[in-house]
Amino acid sequence: MSTIVLILALLLTSLIAVGLLWWLRFRRPHPITAALPFVKLTHRKLTPEERVSIENYLRNQQNKHGFNTQPAFDSHALAASTSSTPMLVLTPQSDNVYSVTRAITRYGVASDEPNKWRYYLDSIEVHLPSAWEQYITQDNDVELIQTQTIPLVISLNGHTLNNHQSENTYQPILPSVSKNASIRKEDSEHIELLNIRKETPEEYALHGPNGLKEACAICIALLLLFFALSGPTVTLPWLVIVAVSLTCWACWYLFRPLSEKDLREVHCLNGTPKRWGLFGESNQGQINNISLGIVDLIYPAHWGPYFVHDLGKKTHIDIYLNRQVVRQGAFLSLHDEMKMFPLQRWGKNLTLIVGSLLVLVLLLIYVPLGLPLKLSVAWLQGAQSQQVTSVAALDKMPLRIGDMLKAQGNGMCYVPPNIQNTRGFVFTPFDCSGIYWNTASPLPQPESETIEKAAALVETINKQLHPQGSDASVNPKLATAIEKSGMILLDDFSDIVLKTQALCSENTDCIRLKNALVNLGNAKNWSALVKRAQSGNLEGMNVLLRPISADVLENLINTAASSFVYRETHLATEALNSPPPGGFLITSDEGKQLVNHPAPTLPLFDYSALEQWRELQRLSALLLDTPFKAEGIITNITTDANGTRHIALHSEPDIVTLGRYLATSLLLLVLIFCLVVNMVLLIQRAMKNRRRMDNIQRYYDDCFNQTLTPPPFLR
C-alpha cells in the first residue's frame, strides 16, 4: 500500500508541477494578444510589396491629415466634440500579420473632421481605411498589424493596401449599401453616447467564471493531502506545500474582490431602437433584428416579450462593446435581475461533492481513523500523566481516554478464549501483550492424570520396542536369537494391556488399539484380555512381533495417547482463561509484549503432544505470575460482565506521528463539512435556479402591469 501511494503521490505531484510551470509560462500575454485578446498567436510575415504599400498609405495619410499622438482606445473620445486620429507609426512588431474573423462595430463622433467614424474589433479600436467602409459585412476576414498606437487593418474581405489608391481619387461612398453590408445608411438615427461606465458586480456575475477550475483545484489539493497522510514521511511536506498552494490559489480566485481590470466597459447610449430586416433575411427571430442607429442589438432571450415597449421611442440603452444589451428603459436590467434573483451556479458545488466523497472513501478504506480521532480529542482536551505500581492505586485513579498511563507490577499474561487463534503469539497460548492485574492469588499450574496415564503407556511401549541395554528378565541366548531373526520381543505384554485399560477406560475409546492387543493376546475380546492381565495370567507372557507389526502397534499407541493429550491440553488452556473477577486487563493495541522474557525457541504447536503439555506447564509457571511494565496513551476503557476493567494502551507518538493524527482528524472534519455544506447548497441552488426565470418574468409582468404578447412584425 505504501509503495502504491508513494508512486501515485510522486506522479500526481509531478503532473501538478508541470501544469503550474506550463500555466506560468503561457499565461504571460504576448504583446499582440495583450492589445488584441481575440487574436491567435499564429501569424505570418509581411511581404516586401505589403511593406511598401503600408508605408505609402501611412505617408499619404500624414500628408493629408495632421496626426496627433493618442494612445489606443480612449473611450471618452466618442463623446468629445473634437477628436483627432491617432498617429500610426510602424514598430519592429509590425512585421507580423495576424488574421482574425470578427464583426466590425462603427461609432460616429460629433466632429467637423471628414472622417468622423471610429471602428472597433470587440472592444479594441483599429484603424480602417475609410474607403473600405463599403466592404464591411457581418463577419469580416481581417488582417492587421500592430503599430505604435492602434492596430492597422491591411486587408478586409480580400481588399488589401497593395491596390490602394489615394483617398483623393476614391469615388464618394454610395448612400446605400449592398444587400450583404452591415452598415446602415447615413440618414440613420443619431446615437447619443451619454457616458461609459464599468459593469456592476451583478452584471459581471452573469458571464464571470463559474468556479469549476477552482473547485477542481481544491479537490486535487484534498487528494494530495490524503496521499501526504498515508504516504511516507519524506513526501509529506512537499505534498502539503503543493496542496496548500492550490487551496490558497483557488480560494483567492473564488472570493477575491473584483478589480477594475475584471469589469468590462458598458456604453450608455440614448437613441431610438428600431426593428430592421438585416442582410436580406426577413425570417430571423424578432429579437435578433433590433438596431439602435447603426448598432445591431443583442437582447437576452427572456426579454422578448418586454423590450418591444421601447421600440420607436427615445430610450436609454446600456450595451457591452459586443452589442449585448445590459439595461434598457426603466425596468429591463440584468443588474436588477441578479440583485433580486441571483443566478445560482451549482457546478462547483457538484465538483466539490464528488471530490470530497472520493477522498472520504479513500480515507475510510486505507487510513484507520479510530486512534487519530481519539488522540486528537485527547490532545485538544489536555491529557494527564498517571503512574501506578499497585492495583489499589489504579482502582482509585480517575482514568479517561487520552491520559498517559505507566503501570508496573506482577500479573498474569492474557489467554485468549479461542485457542485456534493463538498461533501468532510469542508465548502461545499466552498473549503477553495483555496482562491481568488484580489482587487475587495466581491460578494453579495445569495438571492432568489422563496425560500422566498416556505418558506411562507411551513410555512402556517405547521401553519394550526400543530397549536400552540388556534386559535381565530375558535369557541372553534367547534375546540374541530373536535379534538375529529380526523379530521384536514384547517381554511385558500384561503391562501394556493394563496401562491401555487405564487410559482408555470407556468402551468407545481406542477401538483399533484394543483390537490389535486382543489379537496379539489371542483373547476372545477386550474384557477377557483385561481380566487375564488383572488376574496375573499374562505374567511372563512374551509376544514376538515382526518389525512392521511393531511399528503399527507403536503408531496405534502414540495416536491414542496423543488424542488424549491434545484434548487435555485444550481443556487446560481454556481453564487458564478464567481469571478471578475484578481487577484490570491492560493491553497494548499495537501487540507489544509487556513482559521481559526470552521468546521460546519453537512455537507451542510445533512440539509433539506430550512436549506441548510440558511446554504449557513451563510457560504457565513462568507467566501466571510474572513482572510486567506497561506504558502508553489510553485509547479505550471498558468493563466486562466480570467487573474487569479493560484498558487499551498505545505507545506515545512522536511529534510527526501526532501531527499525522491531528491532520487526519482535521482532514476528515473538512471533508465531512465540505460534503454536507455543498450538498445543501447544491439542492438549494438547483431549486432556486428552477424557479428563477419564472420569478423574473413575473417581476417584469408586474412592472409593465400587463400580460405581454409578441407584437406583429414591424417593417
Curated annotation (Swiss-Prot):
Predominant subcellular localization, coarse grouping: membrane
InterPro entries named in the record: IgaA
Signal peptide start-end: none
Keyword Nucleotide-binding (UniProt): no
Transmembrane segments: 2-22, 214-234, 235-255, 349-369, 663-683
Family indicated by similarity: Belongs to the IgaA family.
Protein name: Putative membrane protein IgaA homolog
